[in-house]
Amino acid sequence: MKKILFCIWFTCILCQAYSQSCSFPWENGPLQVSENSRYLQHTNGTPFFWLGDTGWLLPERLNRDEAEYYLEQCKQAGFNVVQVQTINGVPAMNFYGQSSMPDGFDFSNINRPGIYGYWDHMDFIIDAAARRGIYIGMVCIWGGLVKSGKMNVEEAKAYGTFLANRYKDRPNIIWMIGGDIYGNIKTEVWNMLANTIKSIDKSHLMTFHPFGRTLSAEWFNDAPWLDFNMFQSGHRRYGQSKDDKKTLLPQGTEEDNWRYAEHSLAQRPLRPVIDGEPSYEAIPQGLHDPKEGFWKDNDVRRYAYWSVFAGSFGHTYGHSSIMQFLKPGVNPAYGATKLWYEALKDPGFNQMQYLKKLILAFPFFERVADQSCIAGDNGTKYERLIATRGNDYMLVYNYTGRPMQIDLNKIHGKTKKAWWYSPRNAELSYIGEFSSKVETFQPEGGHLNGNDWVLILTDGPRKYVEALQ
């Protein structure tokens, strides 16, 4: 415990120096949807690759020093978005014993002189994130609270007015309506909340966080307040859905999160899409029963690369201990045993940055998902290969290290250079130069789950991989 306290203190010193010397992403302008409606960018055209961590209970469970430490570790690991539950109760209570709603949905006297209130702490967290170039994805209120009647339409209008006026001028806000709920439950409340915020805050993007194995486009693709779609591929493994007819995909495809991206990008109007809640590292398969086994770092890598290569504009990672901020004195959920600050050392948390590094090394807006790059069998379940390409580059994700036949004619250039890229440590190894035809590739390590690699192919003269070296 003494070690973690020292780290928190040292982090606070570092962040002061960092905030004085760093350039921030919003200096490129606010976020907006790209011209091709597939990605996010800043208003000056700079690409934005969303790499999110799930910090659901950050506002409720961490004190100021702990919040600073956590956000610094997120920055160091390459995350540029943290998703939080703005309130997880009506009212919610934070580390300091302060209520989010001392007067219910009347926020006229929320700023009480001499009291470091709930929203003062929220301000602190948002500003601490901003000092590190991190956006806060604010789930305004968790869906179960609305479902149980804790906020009606008029209260949603009052709450949305309060939130929008308080945070419209912060540069690092992304609004998230919903919160693990079907969009056809209390739809009138969600529309009121979203439209109220948007009527006041016209600068920040907005989405809807849906229930597991569903997609926001099912209910809101035509909604004027929705800027991009989000799906929750959820925490179940193949065969665990039990014929749930409310889910978007059929039983037996539960882990195929790439299918949600494909489905969303086929909708019109076309909107960018992201997996806002895939299986978390160290959470039980199926979510609730530890006896079912736990998801590991290789699993969270698979979800990330499958989704992004299938067309998602970014990805959100999660860890069971981190999202609930498990620490001494807190009752664990979902079979968690590791403390949150120890979980920051886990491999999945630290490997996500290699995906962002990879995608940003290549021309961003021309990238498309293209399974025709695979000349052989696409594969099913864990054997599924996922290909994405630009005009003169191609990336193919292979989760099992199996042989694969790739059509090099799908990108420009008479000759192609090839590399293996490791999602585990970002190591790059040159394979060789090839003519434009179908070639067979297989990485080292054998054919087994978790021996995952990205095959990189470029037009011979291109120097894109220099950014990865």
What is the predicted role of each segment?
Residues 1-22:
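Bacterial Sec-dependent N-terminal signal peptides
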Residues 22-240, 245, 251, 255-256:
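Active-site mouth of glycoside hydrolases
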Residues 24, 33, 166-168, 199, ...:
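Generic structural signal for beta-strand residues in well-ordered domains
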Residues 46, 269-273, 280-284, 296-432, ...:
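Aromatic- and carboxylate-lined catalytic core of secreted/periplasmic carbohydrate-active enzymes
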Residues 51, 432-434:
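Short hydrophobic alpha-helix segments
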Residues 176-178, 207-210, 230, 274-277, ...:
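Short beta-strand segments
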Residues 223-238, 242-326:
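Catalytic-core region of carbohydrate-active enzymes that cleave or remodel glycosidic bonds
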